[in-house]
Amino acid sequence: MNKERQNMEIDVDNLTPMMRQYYDIKKEYSDCILFYRMGDFYEMFYDDALTASKVLEITLTKRSGSNENSPPMCGVPFHSVDRYLNTLVQSGYKVAICEQTEDPKLAKGLVKREVIRIVTPGTNLDTSALEETKNNFLMGIMAVNEDYGIALVDVSTGEFLVTELVSSKSLLDEITKFEPAEIVCNENLIISGILTDEFIEKQNLTITKLERRYYEYAAAVRMIKKHFKVEVLDGLGLSGMDNAICSAGMVLAYLYETQKNDLTHIITIKPYFSSAYMMLDGSTRRNLELTETLRDKNKRGSLLWVLDKTKTAMGARLLRSFLEQPLVNKAEIEARLDAIEDFNKNIITREEIREYLNPVYDIERLLAKICYKSANPRDLLAFMNSIEFLPAIKSLLPEFGSELLCDYNEMFDTLSDIYEKIDRAIFPEAPLSVREGRIIKEGYNEEIDRLRRASTEGKTLVSELENEEKERTGIKNLKIKYNKVFGYYIEVTNSYKDMVPDDWTRKQTLTNAERYITPRLKEFENMILGAQERLVTLEYELFSGLRDEIADEIVRISKTAKAIAGIDAFISLSVVAESENFTRPQINEEGIVDIKDGRHPVVEKMMGGDGFIVNDTYLDNKNDRISIITGPNMAGKSTYMRQTAIIVLMAQIGSFVPASFANIGICDRIFTRVGASDDLASGQSTFMVEMTEVANILRNATKDSLLILDEIGRGTSTFDGLSIAWAVVEYISNPRLLGAKTLFATHYHELTELEGKLPNVNNYCIAVREDGDNIVFLRKIVKGGADKSYGIQVARLAGVPDSVIERAKELAVELDSNDILEKAKRLEVKGAGDSPSGAKEYVENKNVIEFLSETGGMPDKNEEKRLIRPNKTDENQLSFFGSSKNEDVLAELMEMKLEELSPIDALNKLYAMQKKVKSRGL
């Protein structure tokens, strides 16, 4: 989402000194909207004013007293700037904050100004604008041919990750996974066209192309060494990761330039490798609804909604990251499961800790604001309140003995000394602003106390003076008031102005009153304002010093925040496991997936826990590699398949699972092809989307992957679809080609013929009870294939008119397609079993993956026949047209445009051909 900016012409020669200053600063930050501080407002001029007035819905005006050629302008009050700033940033704009760097009262001539910070979507620190449970990542991408260096920084928490990728597909998957608020990159990425307009819009990305100086290798190395204060990069784990080093240096340079800050809260850099986590592409994340629902993009109804019972924002972000990056290391998975079991065994102590976590604010983001020097007094009070109960939590942690919880106990610091410092210094009712005073408690500093007394005494003297003047003049409604323009003044209504004494000096005339000053009143004013001004300055200095002292403890605080996040996340998984009756899964490395009484956790939760039908699943790498699942729509096939994928994924994040027993073989990837919708924005039809996804799965899956395939081939004509579905199953089943564990739901009952022909394919169906013309879905997976699709009965349940139902029943009798099934029974498969020769034959005859990629997902007429039709030279295989007298039928078939036929049309034509051939005695 890169915003087009307007381009007004500016007459530089005729600018006033102030506008010339504005112009010079704006030139340096031409890609930003410049917030130019003038008194109590941030003003915008020219193009910035035109843009901001529309986005912020504020009035566009001109400076008072200016001529008609004066620039358009608009402004926002400084005390409410965050609201307007966030609106612009969330709309994809960058904003440069230009402050007055000297007191206007002391300035000789034009007040000095400079940009103190640039706020962008990836560098926003305002917690009110950020999603609590989600990281706000800035992503740096260094593209070198098909290799990529990736750096991810969450400025609001200090988290810093780097990795390297070796394909554009994996790059898009990482972007989809981390959902960066902003991307900075080298020119190569832009030129490559990998990030299409459709992808950028879909992901709501703000992208900035940086100059070479940001990402040159030598400059990047210097930047990283300087920031982390190291002599070599090997100790940071970056050895041999040249592209990652360039991307890390790139984001650090960008942050230093935009934030004008030391970034002291970014204290570690963590290399990660995609091979350490289960790979989930964007389609799978959406189809499994891990963090948001597919339709409404809501958290409610997602897997995260079920699992997230965290009490802190830090714990919620960590739990979300578990879902986004399931583990593939058995020891790491078992360690997480041990932590959950530890909490389950001591529920009373667990609930005590949970209660203490409840008032904890977002320590990670508060710490970032403290280090940025942007934390206000109330932020420090929130920090203090967050650490108040840390000693109580620390005292309970020794009751747990699992490895992870012991590690958290070691990391956990009570931070009692910091609590005492804040408690001793800051007023409990301190204001938001650091420039309003009333921040520091009485008794903390002698000079503060003396100045407060002077200010209070001065105000008392003013009050006494008011009473004296009333008595002296006889003006009973006389009032002494104050404003920032005139200071203290005496106000008298017009009805009493004739009684005003000669020693008063008139200052202002109003419609109904007059305002006056006296020498004595001015004397008191100087006493009060002098004390107040010094008081505000001193309070700010003391507050800033305290804030810096806390920032110096960043390592202790950061470790404690991470421990709190981990404890909170695992308590959440423990609470859900207990309340939802989840069980601890066994983890194996032999590729066995054995689930007893499995449930879909989200569907069960939405149903209120009652009536969900449990189902078993068994898959392995030998005789139970592929399950062909048949049955009518609405019967529960998709729910069953998704539930299996979710149970596997939950096990690999280290969670207990919704089943009575589960033995889960570690999967390196989960792919789903479930449902489709036309991608109109990119001009892709349902079938093209489907075939593209299938091609992606077959290219990127491995023997250790889990595939969830629903209705492959349904987006085209019956024969095309059946051909493709058959060929895909053949391909997956062959361990020399793929051999992945697969749940394959289909309406093509002909595919049930593959059981017995392929040694690792088994048929399952959804049990249905028939009651006359009505059916009842039992939601139970049973062995065997379905012999009916029950489409007409489902149509009846959906409310299709009776006349349509009756006509459909008549047509069904006429269009009985058993002949197709008989042909399927006589088909032989290619590449069956584990034989090398079978695999070789299949590849030589052009396998399905080549077919899909070469045709872009759309079948070629010759290829579609090769996928299912036997080799004509093989006498053991079936020949549909073995006689020359049927050449006219063959010609008709060859000329038929299958992609334009509906299933009904296809069956009608097939029926006509069959009658013609049978009439000739074949």
Provide a role label for each language-model segment:
Residues 2-342, 358, 362-371, 375-467, ...:
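Charged catalytic and DNA/RNA-contacting regions of genome-maintenance
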Residues 215-223, 278-282, 294, 385-460, ...:
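Amphipathic heptad-repeat alpha-helical coiled-coil/stalk segments that mediate oligomerization
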